[in-house]
Amino acid sequence: MGMLASNAQFVEWILKVKSNIDSGQFKPMQMAAIAALNNSEEWHNEMNINLYKNRRHLAEEIMKSLGCSFDPTQVGMFLWGKIPAHYNDSAELADKVLYEARVFITPGFIFGNKGQRYVRLSLCANEKMLDEALERIKAM
């Protein structure tokens, strides 16, 4: 689900590209979006504040456990962290976490050369999964 707001010419170009890439959203996703849009503003605020805040806290704790530094003013559905200097690159840290803790963290190199020293955590996972990931990483 998404939304586009732009001038008419840009919208026309984007719709032309989109019409060749996909043919629409899966119907159950459309129905879920309708249901979500029908919830009250208070419900959305509560979900965003509490869910995001708790997930963000767990992601920050994971970064700290890995020795990664991060900008606490980041916003969005991901948390980026700079890896400690003793790792050669983000792949080395991601592999260590995967093999020793059985937790996948996204190595930044997959986003280009500037990501070599960074890892990315998603805040889309539920709190239980993030908490379990944190405990596994702490046990490494």
Label each residue range with its predicted role.
Residues 1-140:
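PLP-dependent class I/II
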